[in-house]
Amino acid sequence: MGRIWSVGGAVGLVLVLATAAMAGAPTEQVRMYTDHVQRILDDPTLKSADKREAVRKVAEQVFDVNETAKRALGPHWQKRTPSEQEEFVHLFADLLERTYIAKIDLYGGEKLQYTNEVIDGNYAVVRAKVLTRQRAEVPVEAKLLRRGDRWLIYDITIENVSLVGNYRSQFDRIIRTSSYQELVRRLKVKRDEFLPPQREARPARS
């Protein structure tokens, strides 16, 4: 996916950022839940598996995976049937969990400093900086969409690399050089490699 996604602290903060809740000032909501998730990551009494499960439960409530999946598929989304769209959202949710939540052990105690926010109707952008232990500053941007009385994150950008944009370019390349069916096949292979035999793919939150 690109260099930034493999940086341990950035991965941890991506997960921390993927937490917003009741509508209000987006930054204050992100800040409140950032503290919650950061306490989970910093808790020495929790095992890695327990931390992953705790973070997953928080993140799945506040990350608009349906919107993210739709944007990641780009122009190919409208060409899919409703059942295909539903299947893709499920597969994409598993991909996000495998890529990020499974790697929270890489989190190294980095801190988050908020810089500003922009609200435009039902959309908002919260900008921050990840402060690493090496005193480097990594710019982070969370894009949120208001759904009823909640702000939900649908994209995260780190050092100008967008999660949605990154996946969209990968998915588009596979579809154009092969087919949509090949993309689904690859996602299923990745999912099956990740999921233990006793676990079934988790339906995406509607």
Model-derived regions, located:
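Positively charged n-region of N-terminal signal peptides that target proteins for export
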Residues: 1-6
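Bacterial N-terminal signal peptides
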Residues: 8-18
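Bacterial Sec-dependent signal peptides at the C-terminal "C-region" and cleavage site
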Residues: 18-25
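Solvent-exposed loop/turn segments at secondary-structure junctions
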Residues: 94-95, 132, 159-163
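Surface-exposed, charged secondary-structure patches
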Residues: 97-138, 190-206
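Short beta-strand edge/turn micro-motifs at domain boundaries
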Residues: 137-165
